[in-house]
Structures are given as structure tokens and as C-alpha cells.
Amino acid sequence: MEQSVSARWLKRYRAFFLILLLIVAIQLFLAYKSLDIVGGGSGSGFDAAEAPASPPPPHAQARVQPPARTKLTAQQLGFQPECDILAREAISALQRAKTKDCREHIAQIACAIQAGRFYAPQLRSSCPAGNHTANVSLGCFKDEKDRRLLAGYYSSSKTSNSPAKCVELCLQSGYPYAGVQYGRECFCGYDPPPKASKLPDSSCNTKCLGNAKEICGGFYAMNIYETGIAKFTAQLAATTPSEETKRVRIAFLLTLNGRALRQVHRLLKALYAPEHVYYIHVDERQDYLYRKLLELESKFPNIRLARKRFSTIWGGASLLTMLLQCMEDLLQSNWHWDFVINLSESDFPVKTLDKLVDFLSANPGRNFVKGHGRETQKFIQKQGLDKTFVECDTHMWRIGDRKLPAGIQVDGGSDWVALSRPFVGYVTHPREDDELLQALLKLFRHTLLPAESFFHTVLRNTKHCTSYVDNNLHVTNWKRKQGCKCQYKHVVDWCGCSPNDFKPEDWPRLQATEQKSLFFARKFEPVINQAVLLQLEEWLYGPYTSEYANLHGYWQSLYHHEDVHGSGDDLARSIGDSVMRLSARQAKLYPLELIELTHYLHRDQYKGFLVRYRARGSTGKPLHLETRVRPTQQGKLARNARFSKRLRNFEVSTDFDQKEQIARNFGKLLGPQSDLLLSYTLQANADSGAASHSYNLTLLWIDPLGRLQDFNELHVEDSTSDVINHSKTLLKHPITPGIWTAKLIGRNSIYAQLKFLIAPLAYYKGYPLAKSSDAEALNAGLTVALPEDFEMPVEWQQHLQTDDEQFTMREESLAKGKMLGQELHSWIDGLVGQFFQLRESCVVEADSEVSLPLCSDAPWSSLAPDPKSDVDALLK
């Protein structure tokens, strides 16, 4: 009877028993896995989004092996490497590197690492350690689950734990004490264990999983060792100097890139004083900025430009090389200075120069760097410090894992620093017998973002450790969700983060610096937002007068005829020349030479680009003119669709900045080599009580021949706030020149349509097109991106031309694609005239032959007064 009842119960509740059994099994599995934690912090407040990337932990990486190794041949590489390269990442880098020199460089380093003769395995810190001695055992101590003896850091390893390895790990992380427990566990801490917790040595009796001949604590029993370093405490900076304190002089090291000349002038105006030094490094590729800033040397005896220039890429080792070279140049100069502060064109002061000088004068000999503020082991992994990187071909190649040298503390954070002259002299002139500094220089020359860790690590491990102040004098506008989009994958084998530009809505962050020892903020870009800069300047220096000329205007060069021309200028010159011809024709002039293209913004609204050129009138006299041009794209939105009514800024462009949520091709210059994308803003649903909708849409990319070249499937969700979206194409280059159409369609309707121009090119690699074969290769554009076997949905056919129409247009496109000279110019002018509106013109010098205003009187002109960026005002 009992068996019968039991059977009935089991039968009736079988499903519940099975679920209960499954839950128990899952709990047991999770309990087992919890013992295998690789490493964890102890409430350090670490924010995973703050670091440049999220690679797997090093122990996990060591266990992952590629399924099969690819062997590279000398024929593939173009040379015979000195070893059979084994590292999977090195092989990948060699396969992707474009030049033989780069491949040889990668192979040389990979072989040296493989042979164990590249990195120093052990280094010795010279920072005073007090009475601490590495690997000295303090004994066995009783631990508690809720009150850990060493609560700084914890890791667990089933295969490699030992006292020596735990000591090495804790020392690297900056902890004076290391403890092993339960065979597999390693703990780190700042404070010595209390004597009351001492246990007999026999209580620690568990063998180490990494070395069975050694003991690694026991059950809540911990063997504790000294790591050989003292507890590190950053110096507290003084805030005000004494009356007898000598005022310091500062060397401002400006490391510049891009074409924001007026913003650089504005920064110099805010920082300038005759007693300080301004040393400027301009990226080797930025010919325009270097040429324009070179003019300052003859006007200001304390402004100099570096003659030895580097091409610095995001995360590149060349950045550290450049900084050290510039610092060495400053040391070798005749200038007297006490501190060097590195800044970029994106920095701006949040306090006056006098306040900065007062602060540094109160802290002579100290070094200001900002630490990562999180657990060191996680910082190492997130920063990629446990990887080897090689820079060549303007790319940072990851070529494999590495073990950092034992015996030193690893530190890092921001690469914006304020360093004292003695420390700068130390790092730029390493003695041959200084093994520590020599090894660190070699280590960080093959490190991602080296300037973010080099100065910190050198400070922590040398006699200069007592000068370390955990403050780099900067406030940075981090918005992790926007700034960490892997936007640098094209130049580095890693995911990177960048801070956002300050905007007026970020003003409270800037105001909050008033009572803090913060003197600079970043980033600022007037091409994105100038209003916040004006607000900051008025906060520091008082309000501008109402008569101040062109206060809300901003100009930034796009092209200049004196630049070293390359293929990067072909499109701008082709369109610029066309606008010049159209403008000159309108004024009944003969065009001579395109001089400059300049972006113009007013109150942070893009007003078009300015075309400055020379022309000749009927009398033969040369004239100098400028025309404002407004790019247009011809869009239509469905009138009756609720979705269409909420679409804004529906446009095709290139260079979409996910961080700032904007396409940086402001002039809408699109050509056969452009990587197209469509961006749009979907406004929030005005009816907050309405049901939320989602939309499944298709974006069709239709070329001038009426062919479908690509399509994107879009899934759009309603949102309570405005949302900016973008969608990229996968078109094959060269793209067919002419008038393209982007159509956003649903199942039965068209929501939006946009016609935009792909301009033909009149230049090839910096020179006017002279061969029909070159012209055809660039401008015929007969390739189709979609595969031949692609089955076109029937409902899409209505949006395309028929086969006969496509054939006719193809023949016309082929004929136009071979055009040269005047024929080519006429074709380009006919297209440019439809998509670029000539708004207004001016003349540089008055002339009776043209009835145009003077450019100096036209507030939009690049030649109009701009006193906020007039660096010559410093001479008055």
C-alpha cells in the first residue's frame, strides 16, 4: 500500500521533482565554479566601462589554444624570418601588414620574444621600501570569511598558485603583503596581520596547487609574506605658496593634430605669458597646421615648433616617443622652466594662468599624474599591458601575450601629465647602467597607450616615488556608453575609448572644478560646440561686450592650395574647382586658382563652406574672391505616415562619429571612394500615453543607373527621447558618380526618399586626370555590390529602372566616365550646381569691375575679423 501511494505521488508530482533536481544540480555547478574565480576586486569601485577594452583574463587566455597553427612561408612574407613564428596573433598581424618593412619589424620582435631575449624577466625597484623584504614569511594566521586579513585583492588558481607567484602578483599590484590560503587562493593587502590572529605553523598544512612541495595555508588559515615594498601613499599637493616661494616657469608642450588653427590660437591666448615656454609638436601628416603655426616663431621668442615630427596614431607607441623627444628638446634649449605640461588642441583652461602658477609654485619638484583608481590586475587586462604591440604602417599590431617583469609595481591612468624638470631629465637621459629605466623604456615602446602608464610606473619604482601626486590637473568629460565604441579598430588591434566633447549641458562639471586643484578640461571642439567655450571664457575672464566682432562664428580649414596634395584632397579639389567655376561664371569672371576651402559655423549651426579663389576680369586684372556654398540633399518624407513625421536630419554622409553622434563630413563631399552611410534622428513620441511601436524597414541604395546596389534592414524602436541612428553601406569602390537615391520603405509604402550626389573626380593622386584609362577606373563606376545570384524581392522592382533603361544609362555612364579636361569639368559642374547652392560672395580688395562687398566686412567670410582667435593681439 505504501509503495502504491509513493508511486502515485511520484507519478503525480514527477514534473516538480525533476525541476527540483535540476535546480539542485545548477546550484552545485555554480558552487563549484565559484571556486574557480580567476580574480576579483574588493570593493575598489572599478567601472568596467572606464578602460580601453575588455579582453579575457590572462589565465583564461593561456588555456585557449588555436585549433590549428598557420605556418607562414618566405614567399608569403617576402623574406625569411629568423624563426618559425608560433604566436597566433603575430601570424595574424603578419598576414595583414601591407609593407615588407612592417612585416620584417613584426617578425624580428616576435622571434626575439619567442627566444626569451626581448623583455627583462625581473627588475628591481629603487623606491625606498623601509623595513620590508620580499618573500619574508610572517607566519600562519587565522582568517575569517567576513573579515579578511588581506582585503585588497583576491585571486584563485587551480594550477599555478604558490607563495612566490602570489608575492609577485601582489607586488605588481602595489600591496606590501601577500597571503596564500586553501591551496589555490592568493590574497593581497596593505596592512600587516594582527598578532592576535597568529596560529601555529602546523595550522597551515595545505599543499600549493602550483607546487606540491610548498604550503599554501589551510582552511581559513593563511601563510602571509612581505612583498618587499612599503605601502604607497601619493603626496598631497599644497594649494597656496608661501610669500617667499619662487614663482615657477612652465613649459607648455602642445601636441597638435587636425586643422583647428583658430582653436589653437585661442588656446595660446588663454595660456600666454612672456615668462613661460610654448613648445609645439604638430603631427607629421598635418602640413597646413604646421605651416601656419610656424609663422608664430618670428613673432614670439618663447614659441617654438618641433622640427623632428612624428605621425602619432591613437594608442600608438609613437606618442611616448614623441613626448620624450620633445621633453629632451626642451631640456637642451636655453629656456628656463620648472614644469612641463602636455596639452592638445582639445584642452582649455578652467582657471587662470596665475592660479596655475601659484599652485605649481607651492609644489616644486612634484609630479602630477592621474592613477587608474581601480584594481591593478583588472587595469592591466583592460589596458592590454599584458600584450605586446608593434607600431608600423600607422597601425598598432597586437602580436601576442607577454608576462610583465617581476619585481615592480605597475601603475597607469591618464597620459595628460605635469612633470617636474628633475624627473623629465631622468626619463629622457637614462644611464646605461640604469637597468630599470632601460627595461621600462623597451617595455613601453611595445605597449598600447604607453604614455598612460610609462610615467606612472617609472615614478612608482624609482627614487622619484616620493614626488608622485595623484592628480593630472585635468577634468575629462567621460561618457562611457558613447565614448567606448571601438572607434579606433582601423588603427589598432584593440577596442578604445575617448572622452566626449563638452557641451552646455555639461556645464555643471566645469563649474565643479572651481574649488578643486583642477586647471584644464577636455575635450573641446568648436566645430562640434563653441557655446560652451564662450561660456567658459566669460566665467574666467568676464563677459564679452555686445560689440565684439563675430563672437559666435567659427571657421576651420578644409583644404589649402599650399598643402602637400595627395589622394585625400582629390574630392575636395574636384568640388572646390567646380564651385569656383560656377561662382566666377556668375560674376562674369574667368577662374584662375582655388586657394582655400573653409567650414563656417555660426551659433553652432553649419552654414556651409567657403570657397576662396583667384579670378580674372575682362580687363585682365587678377581678383581675389570668396563664396559661401551650402550643400544640399533633396529629400522627401511621406506626409501621412506618423513615422515619417518624426524623422529629422535624414541625410547621407561619411565619417559618422558615434561618440558625438554626428557625421563629420559637414560639407557632404561624396565621391567614388567614399564609404557611405545614412543617418537620421527619430524624434520621441509626443504622445507619452500612446502604445510603443517598432518598425521593420528597408533602406534601398539605388545608383544613377537605376540599379539596386545595396540594402539595409532596419529595426527601429520607439523611444521616450530623440534617438540618432545610422546605417552603413557595403558598396564596392569606385561608386558610380551621379545622382543616387536612398529610399526608406516599409512593406507597402515609402517613408522617406533622399537624392544625393556622388561627384566625379577631376584629380587622381593629387594630379589632374590626364588619361582616359585613369578616368574610367575612377568615374565609370560599373561595378555592382550585390551578388549575381541575389533574388530581388518583387515589391522592390517598382523602385528601380527596367533592364532596357539600365542598359541605356550604362552606356551613357561609360562614355562620361572616360571624359577629360573641359568635358569632364562641364559634367561635374552640371551635377555640383544641383547640390551646392551659391549663397553669397565677397571680394578681398575693392574693384570697380565687381559690385561685391569687401570680405573684411562680410561677417561670414574667413577674412572677417575674429578677435577671439587673434593671437597677434598678444603683441599689442
From Swiss-Prot:
GO terms for cellular component: endoplasmic reticulum membrane; Golgi membrane; membrane. Residues 1-14 are cytoplasmic. GO terms for biological process: chondroitin sulfate proteoglycan biosynthetic process; glycosaminoglycan-protein linkage region biosynthetic process; heparan sulfate proteoglycan biosynthetic process. The keyword Membrane applies. UDP-alpha-D-xylose binds at D283, T312, I313, W314, D415, W416, S498, R522, K523. Its EC number is 2.4.2.26. Its cofactor is Ca(2+); Mn(2+); Mg(2+). Belongs to the glycosyltransferase 14 family. XylT subfamily. Catalyzes the first step in biosynthesis of glycosaminoglycan. Transfers D-xylose from UDP-D-xylose to specific serine residues of the core protein. Glycans are attached at N131, N135, N342, N696, N725. Pathway: Glycan metabolism; chondroitin sulfate biosynthesis; Glycan metabolism; heparan sulfate biosynthesis. Disulfide bonds join C83-C111, C127-C465, C484-C497, C486-C495, C842-C855. Divalent metal cations. Calcium or manganese or magnesium. Keywords: Disulfide bond, Endoplasmic reticulum, Glycoprotein, Glycosyltransferase, Golgi apparatus, Magnesium, Manganese, Membrane, Metal-binding, Signal-anchor, Transferase, Transmembrane, Transmembrane helix. It comes from Drosophila melanogaster (Fruit fly). This is Xylosyltransferase oxt. InterPro entries: Glyco_trans_14, WSC_carb-bd, XYLT, XylT_C. Residues 36-876 are lumenal.
